[in-house]
A protein has these predicted regions:
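Cap/lid segment of the alpha/beta-hydrolase catalytic domain
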Residues: 2-13, 19-56
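Glycine-rich His-Gly loop
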Residues: 1-3, 91, 95, 180
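Solvent-exposed, polar/charged alpha-helical surfaces in well-ordered, non-transmembrane soluble domains
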Residues: 14, 18, 22, 59-66, ...
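A short, hydrophobic beta-strand element of the alpha/beta-hydrolase
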Residues: 176-178
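Gly/Ser-rich "nucleophile elbow"/oxyanion-hole loop immediately N-terminal to the catalytic nucleophile
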Residues: 46-59, 66-92, 104-112, 117, ...
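Hydrolases whose catalytic domains are alpha/beta-hydrolase-1, hotdog thioesterase
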Residues: 93-101, 185
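Serine-hydrolase catalytic core
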Residues: 165-170, 180-186
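Feature marks short, surface-exposed loop/turn motifs that line or immediately flank catalytic pockets
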Residues: 34-36, 95, 105
Length: 186
């Protein structure tokens, strides 16, 4: 993937949203946090940044689901949604995010295999011969983005995950990948 950008207003997204809306569905085309450098100096750097960007996309898609459930319950349902029928559809990286959002149940799903052993392709060597996960829950947040987390003070201490709409379900009832990969977790 050499694309570090995309938008909720890209032609495909607008066309699909319009078609589904004409069929009576409530549609929201949502952006998610971008941010990886496809031209980073090493493959390891590019992989690390891409995995972290995909993780943020999962968090953002789940936060959007909670936003709509919260708006239905607390704000008089301004969008007219059925909170029991919430789905995700994505294309390209958005397709990857919809699949990951529907298959990752917990943080351990992205770092450990079914037997509890590290999924080594999602770990990296920071340069000292040790291996650490590419995504660290205490720094990057949980997969649902329901905890506030910050980068270490040594690299700025800025917020990486802001908990929003905590207490509402992030569950989706269906997902459709209209083009995009599925990360091989095992």
């Amino acid at each position: 993937n050499g694309s570090a950008q995309g938008s909720k207003s890209d032609n495909w997204e607008v066309e699909m949203a319009t078609r589904y809306a004409k069929m009576g569905y409530v549609v929201a085309s949502c952006d998610y946090r971008l941010g990886w450098n496809p031209l980073a100096g090493t493959q390891e750097e590019r992989t690390l940044q891409l995995i972290q960007a995909a993780y943020r996309g999962v968090q953002d898609s789940r936060t959007a689901v909670r936003f709509f459930r919260k708006s239905a319950e607390e704000d008089g349902d301004p969008f007219g949604i059925d909170t029991e029928k919430v789905g995700l559809i994505g294309n390209g990286t958005g397709g990857y995010i919809t699949l990951a959002s529907s298959t990752i149940e917990s943080y351990n799903d992205i770092i450990l295999d079914d037997n509890g052993a590290p999924i080594t392709k999602f770990w990296y060597d920071p340069g000292d011969g040790s291996y650490i996960p590419m995504v660290i829950e205490g720094i990057h947040g949980d997969p649902d983005a329901t905890t506030d987390t910050y980068a270490p003070a040594s690299v700025g201490g800025f917020q990486l995950c802001a908990a929003n709409h905590v207490g509402y379900s992030s569950d989706i009832n269906f997902q459709m990948n209209a083009g995009g990969a599925l990360g091989d977790l095992n």
